[in-house]
Amino acid sequence: MAFSSKTDVNSSIDLSDGYDRLAQSLIDIIKEQQAKLGYRKEIVRLYYPLSSLNHFFEGHLDSTGMLDILKEASLPECITDKLGCIKATEKNDRFCIEIPPQGSEYVHENTSDDEFIKELIKLVAEHDCRPQQIIDLFKKFSDEIEIKQIDNGEFDFYVRFLNDPQDTYYYCFHDEGCHMIYHRFLPQDYSDFKF
């Protein structure tokens, strides 16, 4: 497939790094899903707001422009060789990215397990999980972490690695009383929430 790092949609946007960031995000989420639910060679549907996709491509495209660069004919090999021909649909600036079974299989067979995610999922699944246990788990994987209390009604605190370019996520936690829940955000998305 021929690929140009520029698009007619907005010729000032270099798309090649954006496609790489999108591919890595899709792989990260599939790995997390497989750690939680196990591997199945099946279609995976992941949802992104337009703002998140624009962060990947460092642009300000509208929904139509984003659909144009996510069309099958526009996709570079960095995505199709690994995840197959993904399909994107949009409703109200919310995008569904459908990854064919080939993508699940690729992640299962060609990426290493994320030991941190596996341990985190196991820990938060326990009914007596406490914040200090979560912090201790992060410290097991790095001495350089940031912990911050959040008072926004949705999350209680976040923890993030400061020295891992492969894991730049903000892991936000909320104590539901009987168990702990978490959601992870890329730095740009976390910033958008203005917590």
What are these regions (language model features)?
Residues 44, 54-87:
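Charge-enriched amphipathic alpha-helical scaffolds
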Residues 39-60, 116-123:
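Short glycine-rich, basic-tinged beta-strand/loop micro-motifs
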Residues 112-147, 191-194:
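Short helix/turn-capping signatures at newly exposed starts of structured segments
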Residues 92-118, 166-182, 186:
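Phospho-regulated, low-complexity intrinsically disordered regions of nuclear gene-regulatory
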Residues 2-38, 112-113:
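Short alpha-helical segments that sit at the start of domains
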Residues 130-173:
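A cross-family detector of function-defining hotspots
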Residues 4-17, 76-110, 164:
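Charged low-complexity interaction tracts in eukaryotic proteins
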Residues 37, 77-87, 138-151:
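Short secondary-structure junctions
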